[in-house]
Design a protein with these regions (language model features):
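Class I S-adenosyl-L-methionine-dependent methyltransferase catalytic core
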Residues: 1-149
């Protein structure tokens, strides 16, 4: 087990490639707005240095976002909700936390929610898998149509 990956201080839970590949086959992603040079899932991506929260996500196609899982996650969910008005699908992979304000403000009743069965085995920056995550996950899909306020 990779103890650093499962630490509560860790905010980087890298998407398992096979999990991404299944979603990518469905949506054909063009942008990963919350990546690093090593973890980017799309040829177009933003890093912490280029700050995906301050950039437009309108790059002509679907967006895949597995944001940092820290206190800022609500800002990423709000950004996805707002960017979905651009007409392209936006797909988030986030912890399944229905008790949060961002869930009620920007997800519930406004997006498709797919709860992930079991616990994902996230990876580190080098693709090394850990034990199953200590939290459940969900895929949140803004379908590119006008989202409900």
């Amino acid at each position: 087990m990779n103890a650093a990956l499962l630490s509560s201080k860790n905010m980087c839970w890298c998407t398992p490639q096979d999990f991404f590949d299944k979603l990518n086959a469905e949506f054909g992603f063009v942008l990963d707005p919350a990546a690093t040079d090593k973890t980017a899932k799309c040829s177009l991506y933003y890093t912490p240095e280029t700050d995906g929260l301050s950039q437009s996500w309108d790059r002509g196609g679907a967006v895949f976002c597995n944001p940092p899982y820290g206190r800022e996650i609500g800002k990423w969910v709000q950004k996805a909700f707002e960017e979905a008005r651009g007409g392209y699908p936006i797909v988030l992979l986030i912890p399944a936390r229905s008790d949060t304000a961002y869930f009620h403000d920007y997800i519930y009743g406004k997006a498709e929610i797919r709860f992930v069965r079991g616990r994902l085995r996230f990876t580190d920056d080098d693709g090394n898998a850990a034990d199953p995550a200590p939290f459940p996950s969900m895929v949140v899909i803004y379908n590119g149509e006008r989202v409900k306020e």
